[in-house]
Amino acid sequence: MSKRTVKVGVAGRFGPRYGVTIRKEWSEIYKQKIALYTCPSCKKKRVKRVANGIWQCRHCGYKFAGGSYTPAYEIKVVEG
């Protein structure tokens, strides 16, 4: 079998569709979304995403709001 996901990782499921740049960007965001993060309450690396902006620790059950793809979201200021 061919190695379809060498360049783009999990975005290989899209095949040749959508272009390589969009697939690489989607792959990076998807990896951030499914990664385990450190709980602010018990300090264990067991936090998973429940829904958009909702995160829950699988060890202590602590549920909190955060960013869409990572628990700690960044606020960017645009000067214009």
Swiss-Prot record:
Q: A Pfam family matched by this chain, by name?
A: Ribosomal_L37ae
What is one term from the GO cellular component aspect held by the record?
ribosome
Any one Gene Ontology MF annotation carried by this entry is: large ribosomal subunit rRNA binding
Family matches, as InterPro entries: Ribosomal_eL37/eL43, Ribosomal_eL43, Ribosomal_protein_eL43, Ribosomal_zn-bd
Where are the C4-type-classified zinc fingers?
39-60
Q: Where is the signal peptide?
A: none
Q: What does the record give as cofactor? A: Zn(2+)
Kindly indicate whether the keyword Ribosomal protein belongs to this entry: yes
Q: Which sites bind Zn(2+)?
A: C39, C42, C57, C60
Recite the UniProt keywords alphabetically. Metal-binding, Ribonucleoprotein, Ribosomal protein, RNA-binding, rRNA-binding, Zinc, Zinc-finger
**Please, which domain of life does this record's source organism belong to?**
Archaea
Q: Name one GO biological process term.
A: translation
Q: How is the cofactor bound?
A: Binds 1 zinc ion per subunit.
Hey, which family's this protein in?
Belongs to the eukaryotic ribosomal protein eL43 family. Putative zinc-binding subfamily.
This chain's function reads: Binds to the 23S rRNA.
Against PANTHER family, the record matches this protein to: 60S RIBOSOMAL PROTEIN L37A (PTHR48129), LARGE RIBOSOMAL SUBUNIT PROTEIN EL43 (PTHR48129:SF1)
NCBIfam families according to UniProt: eL43_euk_arch, PRK03976.1
| Quaternary structure, from the entry | Part of the 50S ribosomal subunit.
User: What name does the UniProt record give this protein?
Assistant: Large ribosomal subunit protein eL43
* Gene label: rpl37ae
